[in-house]
C-alpha cells in the first residue's frame, strides 16, 4: 500500500514557478514599478507650487497740445482689490509738436511716433507684445481742434488708428478725453505715486495707509488747466464738477474742473490779443512780460487763429499780417495786465467761485502742482514747497533780467519757453491766488513737482490705473514638480512595465498549473498499473 501525499496544484505549481530566477526578477520589477507609480503620483498631487501670473504691460500716449509723450507701465497680473499696482518703466518724448498741429496733413501724424514705438518694443518682452494694450488719449489741443474743425480732428485720429493696427500691440483706440477725465486721472496719479492709496507693510503686502489724507492736483497744460481735490465742505448738490472715483476698494468724492483755453499757450495768446486791442499808433507793440531786449514777430493768424481768441479778432483781421512785440521787462505792469486774461468779476464776491463764474468749494489740504506749474517754478529756481513771498520775489527778479542774461540763468535755454516764463509766473499767481483762492497761509501747502520716484506726475498713469479696473486679472500659474508631458510619459512607461510583469507572472503560474496536471495524470496512470 502506497501512501500518496496530497498537494494543492496551483499553490505548489505557483511556488515552484515563483522560486525560479525569471519569476523572481519579474516580481521585483513589478513591485518597483508600483512603488515608483505611487510615489510620483503623490509628489505630483501633494507638492504643486502656485506661482503668481507674472507681469502685464500697458502703453499710454499722452497726446497733449504741444507734444506727445509715450509711457510704458507694468503691474502684477494679479490685482489688489480689482486695481493693478502699476509702475512706470519707460518714458519717451515724441519729436515735434502735438498731434493737433497735423490738422492740414493728418497722414503725417503717426510718423513722429516711430522712434518711440521702436523703443517700446524693446522695453516690453516680445512674447507679451500681442497682449500689451496701447491707448492714445488726446487732451485740450485736440478738444479745441474738434470744436474748430471736427473733420480734421477725426482724420488725425483715424490716421493714428491705422498706424497702430499694423503694430504688434493690442491697440485699444485713440480718443479725445474730456477735461474732467484729465483732471480726475491727474488726481489719481498724484495720490498713487505719493502712497495715499497703497503702501507696503512689514510683510511686504500692499495695504491701505491708515489716516492718510488725499492730495489735491493742479495741472497746467498748453491749452487747459485742471484743479481736482476732495473738498472738506459739503459740495453743491448735483454739481457737474463732482465725480466719484473707486480705487483699491475705496470710493472718493472729488471736485474737479478743467478750464479750456486757460493753458499756458492759449492764455498767452489771449494776453497778446489783449495787447493788440490797446490803442497804439506805434508799429511795434510793447509787451511788459517779455524780457527787455527781446522782440519777436507773429502773424495775426498765430494770435487770433485759435478758438480761444477768435472773439478778440479786430474788424480788419488779416491772418497773414505780421506784428512785432517788443519786450520791456516790467514785472509790475506785467502782473497788472495779465489779470485781464481772467474774468474775476463774474463771481460777484461769491466765496465758492473761482473765475468765469465757475463753482468751486474752498481749497484745503496739501496740493501738488505739476506740468507747467513745475517748469515755471523751476525756471524761477524754486522747487518743492515755498512761500508766496518767495514766489513773488523770484518772479520780480526773473522778469527784470534782460534777454541777453537769460541763457546764463536757465539750465536749459529755449527761446519759446524763455521769453514766456515771466508771463507764466504772473499768470500762475493770478490763477492760484485770485482764481483758486490760495492765500499766504495755504500757498506753502502746494508742492511743485515733476515726478515722484521714477514716475512722472501726469494724467496718463491715472488713466492706466483706471483701465486696470477693466483689464481681467491673470490666473495664478500652477507649477508642478514634474512637467505634465514628462509625468504622463513616465506614468505610461511604468504602468506598461507593471502590466507586462503581471501578465508574465500569470503566464508562469498558468504554465506550471498545466504541467502539474499532466504530471498528476501520469502518476495516477502508473499507480493503476
UniProtKB/Swiss-Prot annotation:
This is Ectonucleoside triphosphate diphosphohydrolase 3. The chain crosses the membrane at residues 23-43, 486-506. Residues 1-22, 507-529 are cytoplasmic. The gene is Entpd3. CDD domains: ASKHA_NBD_NTPDase3. GO terms for molecular function: apyrase activity; ATP binding; nucleoside diphosphate phosphatase activity; ribonucleoside triphosphate phosphatase activity. Its cofactor is Ca(2+); Mg(2+). GO terms for cellular component: plasma membrane. Catalyzes the hydrolysis of nucleoside triphosphates and diphosphates. Has a threefold preference for the hydrolysis of ATP and UTP over ADP and UDP. It catalyses: a ribonucleoside 5'-triphosphate + 2 H2O = a ribonucleoside 5'-phosphate + 2 phosphate + 2 H(+). Belongs to the GDA1/CD39 NTPase family. It comes from Mus musculus (Mouse). The active site is at residue 182. Keywords: ATP-binding, Calcium, Cell membrane, Disulfide bond, Glycoprotein, Hydrolase, Magnesium, Membrane, Nucleotide-binding, Transmembrane, Transmembrane helix. PROSITE patterns: GDA1_CD39_NTPASE (PS01238).
Amino acid at each position: 500500500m502506497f501512501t500518496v501525499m496530497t498537494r494543492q496544484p496551483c499553490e505548489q505549481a505557483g511556488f515552484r514557478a515563483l522560486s525560479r530566477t525569471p519569476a523572481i526578477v519579474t516580481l521585483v520589477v513589478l513591485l518597483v514599478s508600483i512603488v515608483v507609480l505611487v510615489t510620483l503620483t503623490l509628489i505630483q498631487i501633494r507638492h504643486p507650487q502656485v506661482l503668481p501670473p507674472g507681469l502685464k504691460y500697458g502703453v499710454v500716449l499722452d497726446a497733449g497740445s504741444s507734444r506727445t509723450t509715450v509711457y510704458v507701465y507694468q503691474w502684477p497680473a494679479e490685482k489688489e482689490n480689482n486695481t493693478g499696482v502699476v509702475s512706470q518703466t519707460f518714458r519717451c518724448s515724441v519729436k515735434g509738436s502735438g498731434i493737433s498741429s497735423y490738422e492740414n496733413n493728418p497722414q503725417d501724424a503717426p510718423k513722429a511716433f516711430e522712434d518711440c514705438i521702436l523703443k517700446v518694443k524693446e522695453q516690453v518682452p516680445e512674447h507679451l507684445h500681442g497682449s500689451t494694450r496701447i491707448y492714445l488719449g488726446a487732451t485740450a489741443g485736440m478738444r479745441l481742434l474738434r470744436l474748430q474743425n471736427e473733420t480734421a480732428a477725426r482724420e488725425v485720429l483715424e490716421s493714428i488708428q491705422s498706424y497702430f493696427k499694423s503694430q504688434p500691440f493690442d491697440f485699444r483706440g485713440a480718443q479725445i478725453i474730456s477735461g474732467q477725465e484729465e483732471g480726475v486721472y491727474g488726481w489719481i496719479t498724484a495720490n498713487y505715486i505719493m502712497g495715499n492709496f497703497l503702501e507696503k507693510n512689514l510683510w511686504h503686502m500692499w495695504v491701505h495707509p491708515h489716516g492718510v489724507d488725499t492730495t489735491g492736483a493742479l495741472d497746467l497744460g498748453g491749452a487747459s488747466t485742471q484743479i481736482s481735490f476732495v473738498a472738506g465742505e459739503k459740495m453743491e448738490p448735483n454739481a457737474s464738477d463732482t465725480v466719484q472715483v473707486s480705487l483699491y476698494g475705496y470710493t472718493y468724492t472729488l471736485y474737479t474742473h478743467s478750464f479750456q483755453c486757460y493753458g499756458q499757450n492759449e492764455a498767452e495768446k489771449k494776453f497778446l490779443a489783449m495787447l493788440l486791442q490797446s490803442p497804439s499808433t506805434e508799429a511795434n507793440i510793447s509787451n511788459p512780460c517779455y524780457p527787455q531786449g527781446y522782440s519777436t514777430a507773429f502773424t495775426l493768424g498765430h494770435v487770433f487763429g485759435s478758438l480761444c481768441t477768435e472773439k478778440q479778432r479786430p474788424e480788419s483781421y488779416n491772418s497773414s499780417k505780421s506784428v512785432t512785440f517788443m519786450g520791456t521787462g516790467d514785472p509790475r505792469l506785467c502782473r497788472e495786465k495779465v489779470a485781464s486774461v481772467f474774468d474775476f468779476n463774474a463771481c460777484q464776491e461769491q466765496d465758492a467761485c473761482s473765475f468765469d463764474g465757475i463753482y468751486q468749494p474752498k481749497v484745503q489740504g496739501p496740493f501738488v502742482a505739476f506740468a507747467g506749474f513745475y517748469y515755471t517754478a523751476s525756471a524761477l529756481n524754486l522747487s518743492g514747497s515755498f512761500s508766496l513771498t518767495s514766489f513773488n520775489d523770484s518772479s520780480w527778479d526773473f522778469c527784470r533780467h534782460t534777454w541777453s542774461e537769460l541763457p546764463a540763468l536757465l539750465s536749459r535755454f529755449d527761446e519759446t519757453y524763455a521769453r514766456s516764463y515771466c508771463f507764466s509766473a504772473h499768470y500762475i499767481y493770478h490763477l492760484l491766488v485770485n482764481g483758486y483762492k490760495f492765500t499766504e497761509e495755504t500757498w506753502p501747502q502746494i508742492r511743485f513737482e515733476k515726478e515722484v520716484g521714477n514716475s512722472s506726475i501726469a494724467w496718463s498713469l491715472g488713466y492706466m490705473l483706471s483701465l486696470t479696473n477693466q483689464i481681467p486679472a491673470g490666473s495664478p500659474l500652477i507649477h508642478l514638480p514634474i512637467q505634465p508631458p514628462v509625468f504622463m510619459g513616465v506614468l505610461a512607461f511604468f504602468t506598461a512595465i507593471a502590466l507586462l510583469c503581471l501578465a508574465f507572472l500569470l503566464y508562469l503560474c498558468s504554465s506550471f498549473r498545466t504541467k502539474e496536471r499532466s504530471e498528476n495524470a501520469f502518476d495516477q496512470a502508473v499507480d493503476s498499473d
